[in-house]
Amino acid sequence: MATKASNDEAAAAAVATVAEKAPITAERKVRTDLETKLHNPYMPRALAAPDTENVNGTTRSVHKHQNMSVLQQHVAFFDQNNDGLRAMGFNVVSSFMFVIFIHGAMSYVTLPTWIPSPFFPIYIKNIHKAKHGSDSDTFDTEGRYIPSNFENLFSKYARTVPDKLSFWELWHMTEANRNALDVFGWIASKFEWGVLYVLAKDERGFLSKEAVRRCFDGSLFEYCAKMRSGGDVGKMD
């Protein structure tokens, strides 16, 4: 009997997500029900960005993966005709500043050669090399999307509304994700999430789970460009 109780205790400890002496593990809860809602939630996805509400990712009628990794899809919108930022509604000054920061920081690591380019191009084929630290780890180091890490963004930090993030919840998330001494990662993370918040927040000042998911696969940018041009985009909750 004692052996059975000991085995039960060991089994419970083996899957525990909270440690009593580490209160932060209780404060930032992780999802324990994902396997009942999403097939293989811990398996990195190369082509699609699913969540518990969209188990196959963004529908093909809205967004096509073109056999690119999810990280490649995330940046490909801006390579279509060199005016992606303008198509989303950012003015010339903002677009210029974004280009300086993004290309200045990420161009060299994606180049196919050791020789720098004065034009600061970003090669989508090598965009996985530009993954920085202090991020959400929703992308792995090869540019695949990890559904469980995406879901945990909201279980950990969405306190007001379960599937939305307020500005301060977003700020808290970027603070919590900081790696030691990673100054570039701290700045890059604040910049990226700040731009996303300005771009996609709703009328109540929340950033929805669906907007964040579609940012990861790049379909959010297509949605915003179509909406700005007066096209039929449907509803995105």
Describe each PLM feature range:
Residues 1-237:
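Acidic, Asp/Glu-rich intrinsically disordered regulatory regions of eukaryotic Ca2+-responsive proteins
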